[in-house]
């Protein structure tokens, strides 16, 4: 069982939760970079003891979309929690890490409030991607080096091309509503799934 650190963080603030599964303490550095057109980010550093779970608050960030990078001296498990407060309700979402996507990636966006497709680029060169919906014109994006960007989308299926090495995710945001999921490439041993009609 993992021990919980004594530091409590308000659920209203964005937070990185980190678990150190090994036997060595982790030197953690967290970077938050605003997506294109949003506020600038910040960086944070903390030591997390082996076998512990700790929360690192992402304070001093303005409202907006951010790409969060966690660097550690030893292997860790990490995710980002954000929250929204609406007129009548509040909600929170976990943004989990994911492996880089491939050059041709299929994404299914379910119905939900304010869906948005996000891209993060850890490389030192800008990357141009094309997002092709099932019908209608494609969306072209330039993802800056060591930064990120995103685009508003609708529910449906999209094919992303040119995004090899990028990390992608989908978020939903409405009045007192939020959710998110990572876009993951197919596994090396994945096989087609046959779906039979009723």
Residue ranges and their predicted role:
Residues 1-22, 76-125, 132, 150-152, ...:
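Conserved functional hotspot residues at active sites or interaction interfaces
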Residues 35-67, 88, 134-159, 179-181:
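A cross-kingdom feature marking solvent-exposed beta-strand/loop segments within repeated
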Residues 25-35, 124-137:
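Short, surface-exposed beta-strand/strand-loop-strand elements in extracellular ectodomains
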Residues 65-74, 155-172:
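Short, aromatic- and glycine-rich surface loops/edge beta-strands on solvent-exposed regions
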Residues 7-85, 116-118:
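Extracytoplasmic/luminal low-complexity segments enriched in Pro/Gly and acidic/polar residues
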Residues 17, 27-29, 45-47, 128-130, ...:
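Ser/Thr- (and often Asn-) enriched beta-sheet segments in non-cytosolic proteins
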